[in-house]
Amino acid sequence: MKKKMTACEIIQETYNYYAKDPERRSVIRNTGNCLYNYEGRHCAIGRCLSLKWRKQDIMFRGNTSNISDMVLKNDYAEIGREDLTLNDMLMPRYRGHIDDLWEDIQNLHDNCRYWDMPNNRVTTDGHGRFETMMRNWEGV
């Protein structure tokens, strides 16, 4: 099993993943909406979910407030596991962080100001946001 990642390691990995090819973002072109899983792509949180959850054919918009919807529609809730959390749904190496980290990472993914899609690159604002996140989450 891979070691648990720090907040900054997760931020760096996420930034590198989408900076290499912003088309990997799980965004519907004509609406700009983000979905956890869309046409083989995953949002920032969706990318870190365990295989069971990544395989869900659920078209939720990609933000942490919708995780509760995802939990309510799964078999854990049906067998009395209403206490399931985002942390439970993540691959083990991503577990152990507060939801605020995931909101921050998801917002990096979602914000169109951070991605120059016609030129397939990160914008100056996007890189600045990444640097701010790295400072804010250092040591966590």
Predicted regions and their residues:
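Catalytic phosphate/metal-binding cores of nucleic-acid and nucleotide-processing enzymes, i.e., regions
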Residues: K2-M5, Y17, D21-C34, C48, ...
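Active-site nucleotide-donor binding segment shared across nucleotidyl transfer reactions
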Residues: N37
